[in-house]
Amino acid sequence: MDLDNIEGLNEVRLAVYRAALKLRSLQKLCQMNLVLLQDLRPILNTLWSSGESTISLAQEDVQQHLEELFRSISPELPDQAVTEATDQTTRLLFKLFDRGQTGVILLRSVEAALIALCGDTLSAKQRALFRLAESYSGNQESDRGSISRSALRVLLEDLSQVPAVVQENHVFGHAETAVSSCFNGVISAGVTEEHFIWWLQSEPRLLLWLSTLYRISVSEAVQHRVHCHACKAFPITGLRYRCLKCLNVHLCQSCFLTERRSRKHKPSHSVLEYCTQPSWKESMASLASSARHALVPRHTRREAERKRALRAGSSAELRYSASNPALQFAAYADTHDAAAEASQTAAPAAVTVESKSLQTEEIQIPQRETAELQKDISVTQKAMRDLQRDKWLLEKEFQVWRVAAQSEHDSLEDKCSELKSMMETLNQHNQHLEEELDTVRHLLSLRHKEELKTSHSNLQLEQDGSINENNWTQPGLLKPHESSSTEHEVEERGTRQERRFEEEEDTLYDLSEDISTNLDDSESILPQDVHTALAQREEEELQEEEEGLHEKEEGLPTEEEELQHDRQDPSFFHGCMSDFAPDGHSDDSEMDDEEDLCELVQRLRNELSLYTASGSVCLQKEMLMTAAEGVRDSVSHLVTSVKSSSLA
């Protein structure tokens, strides 16, 4: 019996109509719309044979009597439909009144629910409810025809459980409030049937669903030959609503209950509800009233409203006396205008009689004041509705603005976090590059020191070798074994030095590859403009290197080539020898010449070794320093580009 998803009933904005529509669907499901009060009386009389109001019924008894009821109302109804209706109604009654799951319910509660959900007229239901409450009172013979407070409270508590089955009981208030409103102004211990019927016709809040359910059931098959102003449906089936503010504007039941807006009509306008198709006289009177309301000047309109207020006050009791359902329409937002329309359609003769009283000045003055007060109240209510609508629109706009601002704030926070992470990554790369640069500088300094030590040791070895050669040139001092061992040690030292140079070159090559890899990683996270700047920088450096190489190829030979050429040229040696050769050739100075020649050879070897060692060291140092400067320039350019892009 979950009615939340039936026919989209939760889309109905007005809680009273939403509850009534759900109860109407439940009524059709249980086939109670086919049951009349005359069909209920034999079954109820059988159950009330004991005369006690606290009779408890088990589920089997209730199901048995309900099956007899449904078989009696429609003999041609299939057995399957009878069984289904019996089961649905039994489950409904026990869901309403057996909250503790005891397995039994009271007879009075069953009778109240069946009377409220049957398909009889509203006046017949009201009289049946009065007789049921009268049976609760247990009055003496002299008190027949009235009900007490306790009896009315019990009846209203049972009836208040009916909308609870569709989760709408929170809308209609409490039973004690309804009892107080019924006994308001009553000095006796009970109320009569006339007063009770009048109170029910005034539609107390607790029983609003009862009259609304009846109007919906009456108007289901009614077709109104007018167009809906909102959805353009023709004809309008069901309840029809005519706007009292807009001229010739009609709404169907669906558009009104969902508060559908249109270009001219607003949900805040006062409307009249029609259950059945009105006659042509009623239509003409309604059209004239709308035209007068829209076209008559302000002072004439005020006079017309005053007269209509007088007519409404005089014909308040005649609104519910007509048995024709066409006269049972009520105002939704403006009670006084609805009463005026009802009085015009119900008793036009009474209007003529009451209009004669306007000739009396003594009655006219208080009535005019009453009409003005009523008009002020209606204007105030309209202003309050407009303010509430403006408040609702402002709240909607504020919600939209807050969502937009929140989304923008979130996007900015995401961008800020991305920039922060990028800056942290770049700082880490920069620190890593600086560490590698320091490592390169340290290795260069160590290598320079090693080269200085090596050159110094080579110089010392050469000097030792020159001494050995001098000793070798002297007669009687030749030591072949010592000279060969010295040469062997020199070769081993040279080999170790070359291996150390190769290891250091491999280390420098690995460091350069790490630097290039880090630069590539850092370039992958840079923006497009930084990549472009670095590419341009690399192209310029490559062009400069190519131009330098081209100039070196076309220019003069390098120092190494000149040195190699001088070494290979015998004239260089002979020139040097000629500088130190003696002018005379005597036999006495033959030993001196030989010693001078050895010294010259030793000096030449020392000079050549120093020149070669210093030249190679200077060349390698220059190459490493050039590479280090290039790395430094690239790192500084990278950091500058990142800072400029982050600031932009």
Curated annotation (Swiss-Prot):
Chain spans, region Disordered: 455-509, 536-557
Zn finger intervals (ZZ-type): 223-279
Major subcellular location class: membrane
GO molecular function per UniProt: zinc ion binding
GO BP, one annotated term: synaptic signaling
Compositionally biased spans, kind Basic and acidic residues: 479-502
Coiled coil regions in record: 367-446
Listed GO CC annotations: plasma membrane; synapse
Keyword field contains Zinc: yes
Binding site for Zn(2+) 2: 243, 246, 265, 269
One Pfam family cited in the UniProt record for this chain: ZZ
Polar residues composition bias: residue spans: 455-474
Disulfide linkage: none
InterPro entries the record matches: EF-hand-dom_pair, EF-hand_dom_typ1, EF-hand_dom_typ2, KCMF1/Dystrophin, Znf_ZZ, Znf_ZZ_sf
Protein name in the entry: Dystrotelin
